[in-house]
Amino acid sequence: MTAELQPEAGALLHTELMSLNVGPQHPSTHGVLRLVVDMDGEYVTRVEPHMGYLHTGFEKTMEHRTYQQNVTYAPRTDYLHSFSHELAYVLSVEKLLGAEVPERANVVRVILHELGRIHSHLVFVGTGLLDLGALTPFFYAFREKEACQDLFEAVCGYRMNQGYFRVGGLARDLPEGWTARVEAFLNQMERGVEEYTTLFAANPIFLDRAKGVGVIPADAALDLGLTGPNLRASGVPLDNRKDHPYCGFEDYDFNVISSPDGDSLARFNMRLLEFSESIKIIRQGLQKLRPGPIKDPNRKISLPPRHELETSMEAVIHHFKLVTEGFHPPLGEAYVPIESARGEVGYYVISDGGSMPYRVKIRAPSFVNLQALEYACVGVQFADLITILATIDPVLGDVDR
């Protein structure tokens, strides 16, 4: 007699939730992130991010280094937009000191800050679409990424983790011919953005994977603390370059792009549209560049130039004190928020009057943005979780610190 395999009419099927580990060794996590995912069949019911696999202890380390030494630690937090972290750090220390940054140094900071944003978004476009199974855009985006890193190398000597900014200004001036190379790169980027748009912006497979997936409405985005492109993709046009200008951003003409959709497609499009705004800002910066000093003239903050060391004993003393001990900001605390490729970055620095910070607290956007993952993923299919994680765009060094 054949066994009856079909349930009786009206009988309920008993199902159990399945718990699945994604990472910490998984290419779609873009680092060592572990996700514990509960699923009912193919649908996600809960996502719990497990962080800490890349914990570096930078905050504590920075409390045992001089203020100037810490410039080399800050950029290693977000290794895709390193300039954002070193800029946020030096701005907070300069606020403590009351330092005066020369105009040329501020313009160079803006140019490199926006080049760093372009670099980060290029990695987002290439790796994000790779997560969805599209291999070709990866090579297109990394073509421009390598050209961008060539510019960093020419200025700093490093392609990543640059450490070029200094409290009070810059480490050194721009090399000869660098601005012409930047202009050539911007022309290349404009052609590249057109190619990226042609490749996937109207691709029906990409649209099916991204449109309406992982929707985060504006009120939820604000409650979750989202900032940057992820917040603007939910219809909230907040940007620290406009709302809390720094480095003279109030003198630059650019638009804050936003979208009311709040889905994965909107988060992708934010980065594409921000390419053009960054290009616009950099071109204005190139026009603003004028010859001039690149450091605060206060010798108690900035190292004296080498030619002064040959003729001035006072310069030698300042140099010795800065190298061996560093400067001493007055008692106080400072926090300057800036706009990185992922959102608001800020370094809360407390001074006790010594040559090392009493406390450094890093406000990193990736850590906060990752808290929105479960909200965006509940109810979607597992394949969509990878899409949503890619569009949130966390950097694990930015998360764990």
UniProtKB/Swiss-Prot annotation:
Catalytically driven reaction(s): a quinone + NADH + 5 H(+)(in) = a quinol + NAD(+) + 4 H(+)(out)
Pfam family, one: Complex1_49kDa
Key word Translocase present: yes
UniProt entry tagged with the keyword Transcription regulation: no
Name assigned to this protein: NADH-quinone oxidoreductase subunit D
This protein's UniProt keywords: Cell membrane, Membrane, NAD, Quinone, Translocase, Transport
GO molecular function, one term: NAD binding
Span of the signal peptide: none
EC number: 7.1.1.-
Protein's organism: Deinococcus radiodurans (strain ATCC 13939 / DSM 20539 / JCM 16871 / CCUG 27074 / LMG 4051 / NBRC 15346 / NCIMB 9279 / VKM B-1422 / R1)
Subunit structure: NDH-1 is composed of 15 different subunits. Subunits NuoB, C, D, E, F, and G constitute the peripheral sector of the complex.
PANTHER family per UniProt: NADH DEHYDROGENASE [UBIQUINONE] IRON-SULFUR PROTEIN 2, MITOCHONDRIAL, NADH-UBIQUINONE OXIDOREDUCTASE 49 KDA SUBUNIT
Location of the protein in the cell: Cell membrane
